Amino acid sequence: MADPFASMASLKNQGLVIQKDNTHFLVERNFFISIMALRLASIKFDEAWYLSKYPDVRDAVKRRVVSSGRHHYVSFGYYEHRMPTSIHINEKWYLESYPDVAEAIRKGIYKSGQAHFELVGFGEGRLPYANFQF
């Protein structure tokens, strides 16, 4: 059977792929960021919502530190666990799937599953509903 990573030989020679095994490969940081930028540029993004939700980004755009909210999201926001658009959860599914969140709501730590998702759940990689995809 052919090595599925054989085509990566040239990437390794260029120093972009650092290490590989049968299931994983480690890539150079800037190479990873450039690959992620391509993927992140294609996801649903709401510029007005993002700038409203994140006033620090809005100010950075006004000061021309970044060219747009989308540019900020692709370059920084994703890695800071910021949401690219408003994402509404299925409350019932979310609380059934994450009983620790339901317990936190009962204890008064969060008002709702939606509040949890927006404050920490998105950053923790929790899904807002079954089969969610960007």
Placement of each model-derived feature along the sequence:
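Charge-rich, low-complexity intrinsically disordered regions
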Residues: A2-F134
